[in-house]
Amino acid sequence: MGKHHNIYSMSGRADIDKLLHSLGGRVTVSHELFDREALTVYGPGNFEIHIPQVTSSRRDRFTIAHELGHYFLHYLHPEETGMRTFGRGQRNWAETQANVFASHLLMPEDAFRRAHRAHGGDWWAIAEVFNVSPSAAEVRGQVLGLRS
């Protein structure tokens, strides 16, 4: 998806904002201090990702990528129409799929393997390359069979 929309820098970092806007999406920050992350789709090419006030920019990037996963996998792919809402925080197959989508989108395999070699498996340094949390980088590395 990221390659199709030409969102990657030379290092492999995804320009999530570019993808979001090209798809007709937008982000709103909740006025509630501890509101949960969610996606509201009004129709194809018209959706809103809701993020709380108190999360880090790296968490927000993963949330946006996660909600894009719902948009592609659970709205566009099954050819849904009309309004639909997806909430984050549940433990089910759709949430797992959205997390995997986000991980692949933010840390594409080839670029991730290059960064892993360049940084000797240092998850903190690899996380910096992709602007994700060290734990997200470590999980991606484990899935790819890479070690620190």
Segments the model singles out, each with a brief description of its role:
Residues 1-148:
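Active-site hotspot residues in diverse enzymes, especially metal/ion-binding acidic/histidine motifs
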